[in-house]
Amino acid sequence: MKSVGNLSPNTSLLFICDIQSKFENHIFKFNDVVGQSKYMIKICNELKVPIIFTEQYPKGLGHTVEDLLKERNENNQTKIFEKTLYSMCTNEVLNHLKQNHKDLKSILITGIETHVCVLQSTLDFLENGYDVHILSDAVSSNNNNDRLIALERMRQSGAFITTTETITFQLTKDAKHKSFKNIVPLSQERREYLLANPSLSSLSKL
């Protein structure tokens, strides 16, 4: 049976793709990508969903923005991989997944650029048998047109195009979830921020 994209914290992992300082002035709604990714990191820390950061040629392009790195939690598994391949699905990453996350089924992706590294990562992870969920409000490109076309391209290949809040409630499933009281304020804070900054909501538009 074809996967319908259900999620469980025990079989999911969040990838933060190349959100590096040198890209700040070259990516459409870069700050929105950072903000939504930061929210997702907090959610994953609360639910103990492991997190992998990738960095594209950090020697020349700098490291992941500090605003995201400071959200790393010693109580949750976090790993950083450097790469030159556009795809995050490097041999090093695949070996890490096979050795340390044997029950992994669902890969969640935020980051940049949607039509390059995010797209190629998605295709490679799909070919390796994983479900891939693209958080559309947390990915971007140099321009929105490339982003939109890439989202449709990934959908055609079998990825699930979704949002950070949708993922949040898919992972928790029940208002009786033990982390519900901690997650609700994070979700409310996100909603209030978007209401106060309506221009930032454009990444939610497909």
From Swiss-Prot:
Pfam families: Isochorismatase
Gene3D superfamilies assigned: Isochorismatase-like
SUPFAM superfamilies noted in UniProt: Isochorismatase-like hydrolases
InterPro entries (UniProt xref): Isochorismatase-like_dom (IPR000868), Isochorismatase-like_sf (IPR036380), Isochorismatase_domain (IPR050993)
Family to which this protein belongs: Belongs to the isochorismatase family.
Protein name: Isochorismatase family protein 1A
Species this protein is from: Dictyostelium discoideum (Social amoeba)
